[in-house]
């Protein structure tokens, strides 16, 4: 995955959909983690060096005016993201989206620190969904889509007894960080965001997934500045405390440039992978990012990024993206006992995968599905009518 202007020096750990990592990939990742952990401390103390590198000639883009540096620890990012999505996205979509703190504490077998270590103040807080307010919260989001009043929406979202208890143990800075994180999610519904979040049940590993879809035309090299990702570095201890394999490790990557694992959450974490992506991630600060269009994007087209060569198994053999389905590769590649794809008569010439042609084919496929469903419905109605007429006779 080319992450924030880096070349192929990033190992992605986790899953977004169909995330079946190969053994070789896991072993390589483990080697990278052990080889890089000695340099984590030095990397953290080099804040000025990292900051200047972001503004230099390393391939990073300029900072966005929308997203200040979050400054959240991994634990804070997990807690803030869980609560923000439960207040904003879950009521709107009608189901619970992915959460980081899915249980009170990782199983004992997954912990690798000694009994003498004291981390009680850093233990992750188990996520508890806000119940009984879903319709009320959804109305708040619908009102925000009309008036776009951030402060008013935040006040309505955080009203109630639960909020008083929640903020009781938070200092002013923690309250500010949480508020800014909620604002990031609210801005997804702004008129000028240029995208929307919709349910997505395409992928086998997700029952209640989501996708990001463009609502306006984006030109090549445009930045989708409100489609924000938030990053927090993970120490080895934090990895053991916060992550559970196959459960909440959907947005974790390992940076060989910074020699540490990084947690990646926020609205951009809902971007799905495609082997022919139309966007890429670009930096907007030390620990934030947005996406940049690689080609023209039409309204209604899903926004996608490339996760990496081995994210869905060896050579992405388990990938379920649209491109793999169209090409007959990844999870759609013919297996033993299944019919092989029709051979190409003349492989010297072929139609290039242009955006317009692919969009036209997709629209034709969608219209064909709709006509088929309408045909089935009309036939069913006709059969029912005929049956009634026969019965009346």
UniProtKB/Swiss-Prot annotation:
Residues 24-33, 53-66, 379-393 have a biased composition (Polar residues). Residues 13-66, 103-126, 360-393 are annotated as: Disordered. GO terms for molecular function: chromatin binding; histone H4K20 methyltransferase activity; histone H4K20 monomethyltransferase activity; histone H4K20me methyltransferase activity; histone methyltransferase activity; metal ion binding; S-adenosyl-L-methionine binding. GO terms for biological process: DNA repair; methylation; muscle organ development; positive regulation of double-strand break repair via nonhomologous end joining; positive regulation of isotype switching. InterPro entries: Hist-Lys_N-MTase_N, KMT5B_SET, SET_dom, SET_dom_sf, Suv4-20/Set9, Suv4-20_animal. One of its GO terms (cellular component) is nucleus. Residues 35-51 have a biased composition (Basic and acidic residues). The keyword Transcription applies. It is found in: Nucleus; Chromosome. Its main location: nucleus. It catalyses: N(6)-methyl-L-lysyl(20)-[histone H4] + S-adenosyl-L-methionine = N(6),N(6)-dimethyl-L-lysyl(20)-[histone H4] + S-adenosyl-L-homocysteine + H(+); N(6),N(6)-dimethyl-L-lysyl(20)-[histone H4] + S-adenosyl-L-methionine = N(6),N(6),N(6)-trimethyl-L-lysyl(20)-[histone H4] + S-adenosyl-L-homocysteine + H(+); L-lysyl(20)-[histone H4] + S-adenosyl-L-methionine = N(6)-methyl-L-lysyl(20)-[histone H4] + S-adenosyl-L-homocysteine + H(+). Residues 367-378 have a biased composition (Low complexity). It comes from the Eukaryota. S-adenosyl-L-methionine binds at residues 98, 203-206, 210, 257, 272-273, 320. Its EC number is 2.1.1.362, 2.1.1.361. Residues 193-308 form the SET domain. The keyword Repeat does not apply. Keywords: Chromatin regulator, Chromosome, Metal-binding, Methyltransferase, Myogenesis, Nucleus, Repressor, S-adenosyl-L-methionine, Transcription, Transcription regulation, Transferase, Zinc. Zn(2+) binds at residues 275, 319, 321, 324. Homodimer. Interacts with HP1 proteins CBX1, CBX3 and CBX5. Interacts with RB1 family proteins RB1, RBL1 and RBL2. Interacts (via C-terminus) with FRG1. Histone methyltransferase that specifically methylates monomethylated 'Lys-20' (H4K20me1) and dimethylated 'Lys-20' (H4K20me2) of histone H4 to produce respectively dimethylated 'Lys-20' (H4K20me2) and trimethylated 'Lys-20' (H4K20me3) and thus regulates transcription and maintenance of genome integrity. In vitro also methylates unmodified 'Lys-20' (H4K20me0) of histone H4 and nucleosomes. H4 'Lys-20' trimethylation represents a specific tag for epigenetic transcriptional repression. Belongs to the class V-like SAM-binding methyltransferase superfamily. Histone-lysine methyltransferase family. Suvar4-20 subfamily. This is Histone-lysine N-methyltransferase KMT5B. It comes from Bos taurus.
């Amino acid at each position: 995955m080319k992450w924030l202007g880096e070349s192929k020096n990033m190992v992605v750990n986790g899953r977004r959909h169909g995330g079946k990592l190969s053994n070789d990939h896991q072993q390589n990742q483990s080697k990278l983690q052990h080889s890089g952990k000695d340099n984590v401390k030095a990397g953290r103390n080099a804040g000025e060096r990292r900051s200047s590198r972001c503004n230099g000639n390393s391939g990073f883009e300029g900072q966005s005016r929308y997203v200040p540096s979050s400054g959240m620890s991994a634990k804070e990012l997990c807690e803030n993201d869980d609560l923000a999505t439960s207040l904003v996205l879950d009521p709107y979509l009608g189901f619970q989206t992915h959460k980081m703190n899915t249980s009170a504490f990782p199983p004992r077998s997954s912990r690798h620190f000694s009994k003498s270590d004291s981390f009680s103040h850093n233990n992750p807080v188990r996520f508890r969904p806000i119940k009984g307010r879903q319709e009320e919260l959804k109305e708040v989001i619908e009102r925000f889509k009309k008036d776009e009043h951030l402060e008013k929406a935040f006040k309505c979202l955080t009203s109630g007894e639960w909020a008083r208890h929640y903020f009781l143990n938070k200092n002013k800075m923690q309250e500010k960080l949480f508020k800014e994180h909620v604002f990031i999610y609210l801005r997804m519904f702004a008129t000028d965001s240029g995208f929307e979040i919709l349910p997505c049940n395409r992928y086998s590993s997700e029952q209640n997934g989501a996708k990001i879809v463009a609502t306006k035309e984006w030109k090549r090299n445009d930045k989708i500045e409100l489609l924000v990702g938030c990053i927090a570095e993970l120490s080895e201890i934090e990895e053991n405390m916060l992550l559970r394999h196959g459960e909440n490790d959907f947005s974790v990557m390992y940076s060989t440039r910074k020699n540490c694992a990084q947690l990646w959450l926020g609205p951009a974490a809902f971007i799905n992978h495609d082997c022919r992506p139309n966007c890429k991630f670009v930096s907007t600060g030390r620990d934030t990012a947005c996406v940049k269009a690689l080609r023209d994007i039409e309204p209604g087209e899903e926004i996608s990024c490339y996760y990496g060569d081995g994210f869905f198994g060896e050579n992405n053999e388990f990938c379920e993206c649209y491109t793999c389905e169209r090409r007959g590769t990844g999870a759609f590649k013919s297996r033993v006992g299944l019919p092989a794809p029709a051979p190409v008569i003349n492989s010297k010439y072929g139609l290039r995968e242009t955006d317009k042609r692919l969009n036209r084919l997709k629209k034709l496929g969608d219209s064909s599905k709709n006509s088929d469903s309408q045909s089935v419905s009309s036939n069913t109605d006709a059969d029912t009518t005929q049956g009634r007429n026969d019965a009346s006779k």
